[in-house]
Amino acid sequence: QVNFSTGW
């Protein structure tokens, strides 16, 4: 799952 807050 991509964390769009960090980009990771």
UniProtKB/Swiss-Prot annotation:
GO terms for molecular function: hormone activity. It is found in: Secreted. Its main location: secreted. The modification Tryptophan amide is found at W8. The modification Pyrrolidone carboxylic acid is found at Q1. One of its GO terms (biological process) is flight behavior. Keywords: Amidation, Flight, Hormone, Neuropeptide, Pyrrolidone carboxylic acid, Secreted. InterPro entries: Adipokinetic_hormone_CS. GO terms for cellular component: extracellular region. Belongs to the AKH/HRTH/RPCH family. This hormone, released from cells in the corpora cardiaca, causes release of diglycerides from the fat body and stimulation of muscles to use these diglycerides as an energy source during energy-demanding processes. This is Adipokinetic hormone G. The lineage of its organism: Eukaryota, Metazoa, Ecdysozoa, Arthropoda, Hexapoda.
